């Protein structure tokens, strides 16, 4: 029974649960790797060994957090669970392909871990730039295994994207237009389109790198007429949309949570929110070279990428102020998901502001590859994506399980986590402005103070992670069942009770459209 249910599942709820469990587990691995990094940097001098092993840990930390934590949780977990419920579909459009999308991830994860176990590991950073990722600087199978791992994760995401696009467009009731679907549905739709358009470019780039390493081609080798800068263009044409893929589903979840706990029946400016997400999705594809301001592009090219990058701040601002407008005048229920959502709005905005700073090509020449960049993207990921995941988890946990989390404990957990991540990443702005470079395992004594503070912050975050595991255990042990759900008419996913039956919407939903 367990084997047929969990290994061969074609049920969106079960596959969503598999994604949530896998993502949580990978999150533990990624957190462990990050704590190794912060332990190494807690004081000057070596702890783990040389820079190679350090960079292997950094690289693995990035890949694990991006491909095996954030994406499986947001898109695979919440997407699978909520989207069919929100549009009244009996399941995903391609339920068996959905199962395959999930089961490609554990082998992919295995290949990534294997890459660290053979030879010297892949100490390239998650960007895998040649010539460092070439077969001279990284002889052996490590980088090849990493590339195969990325191939599997990429296929998984492409199949998932096809599935979500088909489901969202074709499986809603005929009477409902796309502009009547909830914002989370829109967010995942736009995310899926971004995945579908960007991942093939990454696949091309890393396949060319694979043949450069093993088949003696010279796509990225100047000796044979190639150019390593070509790889950077291919990688970042994927890499920049990828960072929007990581945050867009979070935008959708935050919209739902802010509206729900403000006592509003809809978020402020629904159409503005949709168009803002579409604008972010489009602009995300035409700003990639802002990651390459230091490789010697023309001044007019740099001017274009600076301006285009700054334009993204406009739709992002539309979203931030719409969330604040949703809160305005509401009867606010100060429950934990709202705390996570407010933390998201504030800290994501801070991360966005440092992003505007980095968009200036002149300033980026100085700040590129310093801890200022690390601080910037960890504010939008570690306090944007992760806070959105936590908000969504605490909010929808009763829907998934039928049990409620302990109210006071989750609030304490939020407080500890909030202090921990800010103490970890805020000082890194100072280190970056003082010129401390990224991806080095050691540093001059002058940088000791803020590195020590940052590492203490990481230990506080670790306490929060352990506290979260306790909260989960407590909820399943206490078994406080959900009594009643409010506002089901504007939050359709709750309509079937907590937890919903194994099969929902087995016959088409009846939708009555009001005509004035």
UniProtKB/Swiss-Prot annotation:
Broad enzyme group: translocase
Membrane topology, Mitochondrial intermembrane segments: 41-50, 118-140, 213-227, 287-298, 358-370, 434-446
Residues annotated to bind Na(+): 40, 45, 441
Record EC number: 7.1.1.9
Positions that bind O2: 244
Cofactors demanded by this protein: heme; Cu cation
GO BP terms, alphabetized: electron transport coupled proton transport; mitochondrial electron transport, cytochrome c to oxygen
Name of protein: Cytochrome c oxidase subunit 1
Annotated source species: Gadus morhua
């Amino acid at each position: 029974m367990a084997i047929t249910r969990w290994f061969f599942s074609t049920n969106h709820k079960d596959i969503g649960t598999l994604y949530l469990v896998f993502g949580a587990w990978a999150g533990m691995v990624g957190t462990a790797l990050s704590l190794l990094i912060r332990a190494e940097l807690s004081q000057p001098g070596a702890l783990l060994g040389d820079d190679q092993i350090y960079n292997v840990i950094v690289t693995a930390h990035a890949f694990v957090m991006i491909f095996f934590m954030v994406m499986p949780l947001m898109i695979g977990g919440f997407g699978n669970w909520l989207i069919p419920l929100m549009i009244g579909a009996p399941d995903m459009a391609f339920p068996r392909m959905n199962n395959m999308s999930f089961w490609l991830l554990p082998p992919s994860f295995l290949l990534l871990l294997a890459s660290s176990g053979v030879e010297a590991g892949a100490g390239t950073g998650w960007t895998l730039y040649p010539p460092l990722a070439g077969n001279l600087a990284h002889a052996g199978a490590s980088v090849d295994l990493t590339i195969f791992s990325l191939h599997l994760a990429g296929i998984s995401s492409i199949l998932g994207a096809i599935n979500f696009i088909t489901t969202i467009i074709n499986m809603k009731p005929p009477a409902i237009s796309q502009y009547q679907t909830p914002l989370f549905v829109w967010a995942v739709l736009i995310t899926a389109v971004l995945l579908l358009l960007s991942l093939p470019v990454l696949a091309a780039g890393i396949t060319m790198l694979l043949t450069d390493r093993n088949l003696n081609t010279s796509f990225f080798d100047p000796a044979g007429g190639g150019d390593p800068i070509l790889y950077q263009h291919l990688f970042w044409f994927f890499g920049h949309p990828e960072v929007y893929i990581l945050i867009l589903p979070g935008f959708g979840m935050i919209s739902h949570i802010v509206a729900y706990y403000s006592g509003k029946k809809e978020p402020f400016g629904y159409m503005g929110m949709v168009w803002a997400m579409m604008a972010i999705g489009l602009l995300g594809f035409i700003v990639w070279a802002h990651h390459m301001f230091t490789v010697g592009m023309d001044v007019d090219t740099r001017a274009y990428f600076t301006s285009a990058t700054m334009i993204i701040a406009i739709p992002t601002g539309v979203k931030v102020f719409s969330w604040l407008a949703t809160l305005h005048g509401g009867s606010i229920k100060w429950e934990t998901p709202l705390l996570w959502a407010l933390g998201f709005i504030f800290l994501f905005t801070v991360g966005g502001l440092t992003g505007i700073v980095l968009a200036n090509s002149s300033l980026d020449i100085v700040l590129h590859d310093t801890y200022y960049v690390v601080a910037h993207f960890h504010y939008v990921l570690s306090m944007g994506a992760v806070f959105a995941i936590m908000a969504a988890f605490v909010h929808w946990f009763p829907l998934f399980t039928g049990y409620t989390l302990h109210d006071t404990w989750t609030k304490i957990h939020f407080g500890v986590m909030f202090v921990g991540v800010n103490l970890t990443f805020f000082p890194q702005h100072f280190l970056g402005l003082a010129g401390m470079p990224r991806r080095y395992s050691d540093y001059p004594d002058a940088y000791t103070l803020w590195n020590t503070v940052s590492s203490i912050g990481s230990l506080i975050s670790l306490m929060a992670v352990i506290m979260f595991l306790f909260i989960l255990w407590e909820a399943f042990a206490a078994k406080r069942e959900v009594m009643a759900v409010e506002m089901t008419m504007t939050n359709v996913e709750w309509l079937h009770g907590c937890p919903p039956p194994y099969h929902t919407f087995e016959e088409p939903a009846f939708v009555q459209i009001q005509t004035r």
